[in-house]
């Protein structure tokens, strides 16, 4: 099966991909990896390795475009251009580019990915997580249009499990024909990793991803100056609008903001990557005497995503009150009518506390009792339908039968890993799931 792999290039997992190819389970045509991992991968596979930035700035033969994406296919992608724009914007490599170049980058990647799929007769694309980053999302969207299978690993934050799906819209449904692997993984040995990014990266490694030292200096000078401006603007508007104290005597919905830019909204949020749109829809369905308590995410540090008009728009949504940051999240969960989120863990925390959750995006826990997926016409009565949160553990245990005991994303988990067992688990999983296709 002619295959593209996106990720799975970390030292502890890459051998599983190589064995899948060597054993004829997949025919590895291209492998999208981090630049720093090139030298760690077997020399025999160097000709299939791709780093996404090379697609847009390399004149090497491997990156030549043989076929331009046809107009009718490009038109189907146009509704996603705002999302692609957002995913480019988050990359520091593209600091200070023009609006015209956003379109140039998008079309370069569309043409490359389309050409790659057609030339190599791709039948399957494996993603190590929900596709994010502009090249990955474009490749996923093209695969759907061209009827190429997509296998997506998905980390279930909160229960430390890796699930899979064939389509992002299946996230949270998890309907499979039969259990694939019975997990013997001990949850006590798996913990959340607080910070997956090393603080010891040297300046040289940071410069390597830019065209030259001057490019790095210029972009970082621009970025630092603009960050200073946006930070001061952020402080001003948060002091102006996030001023309300918590009043538990009134009925309210708790709607915590998401960190942006992140995959949880950019990819999994669908059109609700615009998270204020979700709050506007929420405002329409709740009773007139209810309010929406909005609280900023404490980890929001990219101030460009909280511009002046973000705050102006948020403050003008009927029934919204923006809370001071010192308000206890536990108290909000305890006293709210329900929690509203796009894909956040706040919804999972809510149902475990016996409170309903309304979700707007593709979230892994949407199959659990107490969770409602937003649709036009949903009612508060439907969202607040009674549920037994004791059933949550039963549902989670059922889900474990369909989850992968192997680890694919070390950035989110730390684990006393038996690499040989991990390879076997990944291999067994892929052999079983691909043999059913």
Where are these regions (language model features)?
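Catalytic donor nucleotide-activated moiety binding site of glycosyltransferases and closely related
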Residues: 280-324
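Active-site donor-nucleotide binding/catalytic segment of nucleotide-sugar enzymes
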Residues: 246-276, 283, 290, 296-300, ...
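Conserved nucleotide-sugar donor-interacting segment of glycosyltransferase catalytic cores
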Residues: 112-175
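Leloir-type glycosyltransferase catalytic cores
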Residues: 176-211, 370-437
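Histidine-anchored nucleotide/phosphate-binding helix
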Residues: 6-24, 33-35, 140-141, 271-286
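Conserved N-terminal ligand/cofactor-binding loop architecture of enzyme catalytic domains
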Residues: 18-113, 119, 158-235
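Structural alpha-helical scaffold elements that stabilize or flank donor/cofactor-binding regions
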Residues: 118, 246, 314, 331-335
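A donor-sugar binding/catalytic signature common to diverse glycosyltransferases
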Residues: 127, 131, 154, 325-372
């Amino acid at each position: 099966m002619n295959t593209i792999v996106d990720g799975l290039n970390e030292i502890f997992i890459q051998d599983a991909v190589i064995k899948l190819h060597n054993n004829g389970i997949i025919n590895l045509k291209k492998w999208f990896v981090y630049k720093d991992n090139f030298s760690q991968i077997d020399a025999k596979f160097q000709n299939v390795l791709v780093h996404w930035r090379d697609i847009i700035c390399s004149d090497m033969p491997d990156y030549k475009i043989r076929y331009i994406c046809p107009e009718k296919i490009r038109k189907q992608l146009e509704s996603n251009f705002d999302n692609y724009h957002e995913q480019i914007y988050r990359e520091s490599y593209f600091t200070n580019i023009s609006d015209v170049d956003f379109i140039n980058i998008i079309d370069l990647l569309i043409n490359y990915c389309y050409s790659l799929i057609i030339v190599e007769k791709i039948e399957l694309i494996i993603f190590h997580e929900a596709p994010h980053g502009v090249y990955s999302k474009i490749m996923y969207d093209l695969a759907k249009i061209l009827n190429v299978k997509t296998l997506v690993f998905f980390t279930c934050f909160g229960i430390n499990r890796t699930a899979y799906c064939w389509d992002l819209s299946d996230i949270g449904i998890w309907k499979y024909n039969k259990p694939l692997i019975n997990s013997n993984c001990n949850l006590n040995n798996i913990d959340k990793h607080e910070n997956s990014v090393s603080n010891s990266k040297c300046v040289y490694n940071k410069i390597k991803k830019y065209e030259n030292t001057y490019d790095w200096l210029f972009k970082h000078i621009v970025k630092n100056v603009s960050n200073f401006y946006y930070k001061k603007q952020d402080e001003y508007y948060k002091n102006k609008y996030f001023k309300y104290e918590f009043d538990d005597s009134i009925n309210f919905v708790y709607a915590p903001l998401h960190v942006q830019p992140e995959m949880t909204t950019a990819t999994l949020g669908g059109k609700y990557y615009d998270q204020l749109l979700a709050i506007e829809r929420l405002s329409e369905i709740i009773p007139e005497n209810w309010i929406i308590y909005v609280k900023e995410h404490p980890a929001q540090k990219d101030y460009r995503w909280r511009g002046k008009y973000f705050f102006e728009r948020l403050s003008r949504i009927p029934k919204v009150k923006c809370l001071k940051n010192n308000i206890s999240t536990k108290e909000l969960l305890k006293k709210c009518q329900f929690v509203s989120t796009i894909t956040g863990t706040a919804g999972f925390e809510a149902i475990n506390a016996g409170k309903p959750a309304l979700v707007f995006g593709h979230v892994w826990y949407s199959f659990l009792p107490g969770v409602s997926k937003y649709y036009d016409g949903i009612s508060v009565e439907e969202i607040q339908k009674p549920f037994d949160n004791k059933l949550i553990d039963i549902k989670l245990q059922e889900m474990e039968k369909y989850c992968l005991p192997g680890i694919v994303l070390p950035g989110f988990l730390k684990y006393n890993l038996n690499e040989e067992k991990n390879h076997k688990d990944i291999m067994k999983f892929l052999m079983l799931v691909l043999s059913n296709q």
